[in-house]
Amino acid sequence: MSNTVNEYSTERKAFIITGPTSGIGRCTALELARHGTVVLVGRDPRKLYLVQKTIEGKGGHAVSVICDVSDLTSVRHAAAEIIALKLPLAGLVNNAGVLAMQATKNAQGWDTAFATNHLGPFVLTEALMPHLPDGANVVFVCSGVEDPERRPAVVAGFRGGRYISAEASARGEWKSGGSTLPGADAYATSKQCNLATVTAFARETPRLRFNAVEPGFSPATGLGRDANVFVRFLGKHVLSLFAPYIKYWSTPERAAKVITNAVLNGAGVTGIYYDERGKPMLGSEQVRDPKFQDRIVAETRALLAKTPM
């Protein structure tokens, strides 16, 4: 299902974003709408409608495509729907993500967090790549928690990516010695896979630009939507007030500007990982290894090839 806007101009560039209905994704969608048509990809029709109407109310253009990014069949259908719109695509933002407090399975029987954060964006990106023009920007919203040496992540209880293999991750299995925080290993590992994918794709497909953004810790975002009411209230109404003044922290609005700048960047840069201030940063030692990057991409493709969708 799609909901196209009236009076669409084929001269306007179009930008695709997943997870556009709250937090960083919503702010980024509103930023991108200042520069072209925004394809809003999300699972909740009502929330998509509200964001689309907000964009249109500001004089922008938007298209809504319903998709559960954790369901790979849904992702395939969404990609086909986007392609069928025949919009002048200029960029893709893989923003949808989840930090699940409890492990669950997706429609294919795989770990939902790993499917949402890595497999879904991987499938969507590969499906759309042939339809993106030379120089188009693909941005993955990543996270520094994949790095076991990143101090704020360690203080928060993360222990870095715990990758064994794509199949093990799909089963919800992680390398021993990880975090005691519920969902932390799944989140960190999936985000490490995101970053590895960005750098591998940047080498594989030089006609496109692949970059990553660490948006900073934003207490008001929806990543922890499975957390209890008190934790969600604390993040949204208390901690978010201090975010602009703390290193490694940010706000959805500030993160949106960094992401939008990466999408609009016409300098031809690729394979860059930006921090919450828009400055280049390094990922973990492991994820910087080209062999590790290629392994994750190869194993992900092999896993997907065996899966009926």
What are these regions (language model features)?
Residues 239-281, 290-292, 302:
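C-terminal helical subdomain
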Residues 160, 175-184, 217-254:
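Alpha-helical membrane-targeting segments
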Residues 150-154, 222-227, 285-286:
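Short aromatic-enriched loop/helix-cap "lid" or pocket-rim segments at secondary-structure transitions
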Residues 46, 73, 253, 291-294:
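A generic "alpha-helical surface" signal
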Residues 101-102, 282-285:
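A generic structural signal for short coil/turn motifs at secondary-structure boundaries
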Residues 107, 184-187, 245, 286, ...:
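Active-site oxyanion-binding pockets that recognize sulfate/phosphate
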Residues 284-309:
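C-terminal amphipathic/interface module of NAD(P)-dependent oxidoreductases
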Residues 2-219, 307-309:
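Rossmann-fold NAD(P)H-dependent dehydrogenase/reductase core
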